[in-house]
Amino acid sequence: MIVYVDPDLPGITRKKVCNGWGYWTAKGVRITDRDEIDRLNKIALPPAYVDAWFCPSPHGHIQAIGYDAKGRRQYRYHLDFRAKQEAEKFDRLAHFGRALPLLRAQVERNIAGRPTDRDTVIAAVVRLLDEGRIRVGNEAYATENKSFGATTLRNRHATVKGSKLSLQYRAKSGVMRKLTVTDRGLLRVVRKVQDLPGQNLFQYLNDDGTACPATSTNVNAYIKEAMGEDFSAKHFRTWSASVIALEHIVAACRTGGKVKLADLLEPVAEALGNTPTVARKSYVHPLVLGLKDAGFDAKTLPRRTRWLSPAERALIALLDETSEEVAKAAA
């Protein structure tokens, strides 16, 4: 059973000793129980992390915290907690897909507004999340790590040439990303906001004419309001990964070819700027991965609607069908 813990409360600390690590309770008593020492060692908090904190309970959702060389707080979560988080993320994917037309329709309305208006700029950021599959960004990461996302992109990262927006920037973990977007509405906004003072790419003018950068808080609030549920920018990448993988499976099934896992994950990893391993573990829905061997009847692919592609509609149907089967089995 997982217990939610407060990492700001006193916990277990560690010190280097001759044969590895020694651990001390919050009261300063050295831990000698072999099973407890083994538990703490298995957490595998990197030796270079300083000011280490370990959860006194083996059931805490956070098992350890440390600070890396750049002073960033790093967490080690309980494996069961991580599994629960991943399961919840995938469980809500069908709900996200069904609500996506509401968001896309709202973005279409707002992105046609005055290019420097708040809602227009926020809509442009959401369009970039949808089309470019990039992270939303966080100003703290941009300042401390020099890694960027949609809301923290600088003008120097963007080049508009003709009908193309080219982005080149350093993403999470220092990965250099290059992508090209051709969406007309997005380009129209970018051309205008690049003329505003300041380094940030996505800025809007407030009531007194001051340029204000779009933030992840703005974007997530916009998404939640439009979709009517507690969704956020992070859901786009999970959704896109599963759709791209399903599209690859459909294409292979149409030609009668066999789907290899590496070939399936490569386009997903490229689109998200991750490794194939990360794409498999954290982004592509397990049910879609299962189709690699089970196959998919491409003839049953739904028609495109205004706001959803055939693969997106097929993914929703697949997830709904599986949920119904699970519900029947549990009844």
Task: Give a label for each model feature.
Residues 263-268, 274, 284-303:
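C-terminal structured "cap/appendage" subdomains that terminate the fold
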Residues 1-148, 154-261, 265-272, 277-281, ...:
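A positively charged, amphipathic N-terminal helix/segment that binds anionic biomolecules
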Residues 288-295, 302-331:
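Short, amphipathic C-terminal "tail helix"
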Residues 168-172, 180-182, 292-305:
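Short Lys/Arg-enriched helix C-cap and helix-to-coil transition segments
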